[in-house]
């Protein structure tokens, strides 16, 4: 392509689809000038802009191309003068915008069925938000095709600088809903922490930082993750290098801030993912102290599936006029079918064995209510001849990281865990969740079953209910306004397999 028109109409230097943004390419090299010695400069004072000789038969595209070159001349001549209105762009935007898209390394298209939780959109495209070209490249190469409903609502508002209180179901694209505006607003030439993303667990911190790195892989943005249970010394050394976006747990970030290593005076955006958990008594004091280190004009984005009373108190104090997004017409995901089976405690392992033999499991997560029961059940499942990992909060951090990584990469079919794993963990291959021990609260139940049926796909939740659990089952059904049916002798694979 001619270097003088390196950025075709409508998608200027580093901007996606903005017809008012003009990018100017570098002047042609000496080799190129030698090639076109027969050409005359169009203006005596602007030798670097060289116009081609007219072709005998011009196609509309060539005409558009020349129009663009001439527009560059006009822009150069008008430097220092008042800004001129851009002439209307013809149908060149759509055709020329395919040039950079054609070079993208797109993943295989996901052709599985998706529910309305992610498809009921207004029809917007990511390019409608005038994002940086490099960020758009990362978005498409991550496999995102169009914004989900929560992304449509939050991305344009977050880009304006408003505070946001967003409530949406698990697995509907909340992470990208705050990562995309965060990456867009970061000035990569400014060596300072500009965005902090707070999450309640170490696994979620690793997952979120990975999403940020993948979306921003064409940007020169440095992402760092820091959590408790890892080397403080390594984090301190890392913070002396450039860091633009920091992801971590509140306690560790506060610790680094108090030591004067993590400087937040230029941090313009604070994101709280799983905000209801972050505002529990365990984390809230750390977060309130951390906010004191932020500038007064900072922007706060809060995302969660559930918002208890503690969130309201925090909102009233720190988010006086937030933009409220509520996409929770119902609490459970449309694609998840829920069943229960009445069993005695001593029959649970036998029942689990029957489920393994009858269900078409891609990957499953099995929840227990205590650390001891996790380890015992994992041992039993292995004895039955099924591959199984387990994870809980009392394991060493390195071991937890390895299990999480291996399970996500498909090294094992079944994972037994405590509620540590209920928040935000996004493993697309999981299509079955089994509550070996039924949870005590509706909130926990909601987060557990939300591990299957990610991003509008189909999933199955099976609950093993003892005599003592029967009242809890009824109460949770009422609170969530959902139906948990008795398990039939045969389950149609079409309801949870794509």
UniProtKB/Swiss-Prot annotation:
What Gene Ontology cellular component terms go with this record? Answer: cytoplasmic stress granule; P-body
Binding annotation for ATP: 168-175
Chain span(s) of sequence motif Q motif: 124-152
The record's EC number reads: 3.6.4.13
Q: Where is this region: Disordered?
A: 1-109
Is the keyword Cytoplasm in the record?
yes
Please list the residue ranges annotated as the Helicase ATP-binding domain: 155-325
The protein's matches in Pfam families, at most eight in alphabetical order, are given as:
DEAD (PF00270), Helicase_C (PF00271)
**Protein role:** ATP-dependent RNA helicase involved in mRNA turnover, and more specifically in mRNA decapping.
Q: What is known of its domains?
A: The Q motif is unique to and characteristic of the DEAD box family of RNA helicases and controls ATP binding and hydrolysis.
Q: What is this protein called?
A: DEAD-box ATP-dependent RNA helicase 6
Q: Source species, please?
A: Oryza sativa subsp. japonica (Rice)
